[in-house]
């Protein structure tokens, strides 16, 4: 903790609240996060929000290449100074939401990358869906996030936390909770507990779907209003190519009644419903 404060003081930097800057200051947690990524010497890592570069250096000692993405210009200057001895680190001043992961693939002739990062709580959902959009370029993601966000990713059907993120990420990745990180591990202390989540993204979805775009569309429509039944939400979606009668018949064929809500349907059932819609 003292070390982090000292670096900030030496560079006359104060954490920027609007960027959600809370610097991880526990070295044991940093080491565990990097170990969870199981970095091999021929792999490329993209780090989200490299901050002061403390965890970046741990990655650089293991990986072939590290792309350290940081939006704060002052921190970029710190990173370039602190990491200048690592010739396998590229410091990128930019917004991760605008970062093209194909850049990391193209420069280093690799097929897949790994992602490590402490996601700012205020933009956790946009970052997660940016990762999901680029899933074909990513093999593993080890991400620290607000506990409530991790709860939604790892939820089971029938619970309040089960929703759109659960189903969409659950189709494409094996997700596991790995660490709980207390507020005292950061400077300044956040008001919430953090969780480190590991995502393993295989070549193919965990459940086969005929049409990815239709799956996204279906899931988002199904959860539009949680208190309504899935059937009513689909009616309100006004799909020209999908009338309520078809949905009702398909749900009945799956053994799910017309009163079922979206949060009661498993990821596998969503995939089956999507495929039935594709072929019916």
Curated annotation (Swiss-Prot):
It is found in: Cytoplasm. Specifically dimethylates two adjacent adenosines (A1518 and A1519) in the loop of a conserved hairpin near the 3'-end of 16S rRNA in the 30S particle. May play a critical role in biogenesis of 30S subunits. HAMAP family: 16SrRNA_methyltr_A. SUPFAM superfamilies: S-adenosyl-L-methionine-dependent methyltransferases. It comes from Syntrophus aciditrophicus (strain SB). Its EC number is 2.1.1.182. Belongs to the class I-like SAM-binding methyltransferase superfamily. rRNA adenine N(6)-methyltransferase family. RsmA subfamily. It comes from the Bacteria. One of its GO terms (cellular component) is cytosol. It catalyses: adenosine(1518)/adenosine(1519) in 16S rRNA + 4 S-adenosyl-L-methionine = N(6)-dimethyladenosine(1518)/N(6)-dimethyladenosine(1519) in 16S rRNA + 4 S-adenosyl-L-homocysteine + 4 H(+). This is Ribosomal RNA small subunit methyltransferase A. Its main location: cytoplasm. S-adenosyl-L-methionine binds at residues 24, 49, 70, 95, 118. Keywords: Cytoplasm, Methyltransferase, RNA-binding, rRNA processing, S-adenosyl-L-methionine, Transferase. One of its GO terms (molecular function) is 16S rRNA (adenine(1518)-N(6)/adenine(1519)-N(6))-dimethyltransferase activity.
